[in-house]
Amino acid sequence: HRTVLSAIRKRSVAGKIEITVDGLVGDDQGDKTNHGGIDQAVYLYSSEDYFWWSGQLNYVLPPASFGENLTLSSFGKNPVRVGDRFRIGEVLLEATGPRIPCSKLATTMGDPEFVVRFEKAARPGVYTRVLKPGFLQKGEIVEQIFGSMDAPTVPEVMRLYGAKKPAPEELRQALRAPLAVRTRTRLEHKLAIINQGTD
């Protein structure tokens, strides 16, 4: 699948942007406890999902409303799975899971119920780790390289993350994928609780 990188977070950028294993150079996270890290180094969102949200909210959201580092034109017809990769110029990214919404997103949107809306919408964007650093710029072609079809989709991981009684086999299958550490820890904890109840 091929799509187009359409914008870069926060401001219009002329020229090339450097991406390292820590993310975009010059683009830091304010809350490093819950955001960022090498397996959540670059957060992708799509213009297609922005268009959907504009229809739901009846107004046009400004760029980077969801805190993404890079905005793609589309994620394509098939949901992104954990382990799928994105080649953007010389940069190679690997999907590690969804953005888990928090109160900061609700504050940004001016809607105390927006976290619930975001979860129900199942359009969480995609956290990625940087497998190959390099430079990119607006307008680059994006090539999606599909990973294992056994891996969970990113929306499925978000559902498992918030589920009160997730199916243990779904958790086990998700944990076989290259998840971000914070998400992996949460799902491992859920599975441990289930296993304790069956001992």
Residue ranges and their predicted role:
Residues 1-106, 113-114, 146-199:
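Electropositive, beta-rich accessory/interaction domains or terminal extensions
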Residues 74-76, 122, 132:
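Short loop/turn positions at the edges of beta-strands in beta-sheet-rich folds
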Residues 112-130:
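A mid-sequence, solvent-exposed acidic-amphipathic segment
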Residues 143:
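Acidic, Mg2+-coordinating catalytic module of metal-dependent nucleases/exonucleases
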Residues 26-29, 128, 137:
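Short, flexible micro-motifs
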Residues 83, 133, 138-140:
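Loop/turn positions that initiate beta-strands
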